[in-house]
Amino acid sequence: MISYEFQTHLPKGKDSSLNASSENKELYVQATHFNNTILLQIRLNGEMDSTYEVSSKGLNPILDINVPLAGNLGNTGGDYDDEEEEFVRDHLSDYQVVTKLGDSADPKVPVVCVQIAELYRRVILPEVSGTMAQDNMQFSLLISMSSKIWRATKEQSADDNDFGKLVFVLKCIKDMYAK
């Protein structure tokens, strides 16, 4: 069992969907690696109110093609239909997200969980020396987090800065392993 921790404050631009009356929003990230499971806790001011289990399913274990996340970004200069020649990988179909505790109707959280799982599969697990570094990278990820990170207030639209929040959380997870 190996454990990692990271603690930071949310920048003012990232916590606009949270209660504006409180200033310091503390984000605490902790990961505990077991033999075949990673327990990831993402706390906002010490609170966690939802738990999700992310496991590898779909075509990923069978067909592990190393395709960039954005597909083929280069222009080959040929006049042909890109849809016929290019294989686009849907990473959402590679994982199964099961809500253990929390709002199962929230459409944002499964996407967040899949992005965290992709970060682990592509970046973190290959870099962590000897820890679960297997050829097929089969692992289960148990994510407990505060859903308040993704909630919007009445004054703003539902998707206001969600991408920025996701990038910030992913960066915090990656920085946790850099220490």
UniProtKB/Swiss-Prot annotation:
Q: Which GO terms describe its biological process?
A: chaperone-mediated protein complex assembly; nuclear-transcribed mRNA catabolic process, non-stop decay; proteasome assembly
Which cysteine pairs are covalently linked by disulfides here?
Answer: none
Instruction: Keywords in alphabetical order, please.
Output: Chaperone
Q: Known Pfam families for this protein?
A: POC3_POC4 (PF10448)
Cellular-component GO terms for this entry: cytoplasm; nucleus; protein-containing complex
What is the recorded function of this protein according to its Swiss-Prot or TrEMBL entry?
Answer: Involved in 20S proteasome assembly, facilitating the alpha-ring formation.
Q: Hey, which family's this protein in? A: Belongs to the PSMG3 family.
Self-association state and partner proteins as the record states = Component of the 20S proteasome chaperone. Forms a heterodimer with POC4 that binds to proteasome precursors. Interacts with POP2.
Which additional comment does the entry carry? Present with 1820 molecules/cell in log phase SD medium.
Protein's name in the database: Proteasome chaperone 3
Per the UniProt record, the source organism is Saccharomyces cerevisiae (strain ATCC 204508 / S288c)
Q: What is the lineage of its organism?
A: Eukaryota, Fungi, Dikarya, Ascomycota, Saccharomycotina
Q: What gene is this protein translated from?
A: IRC25
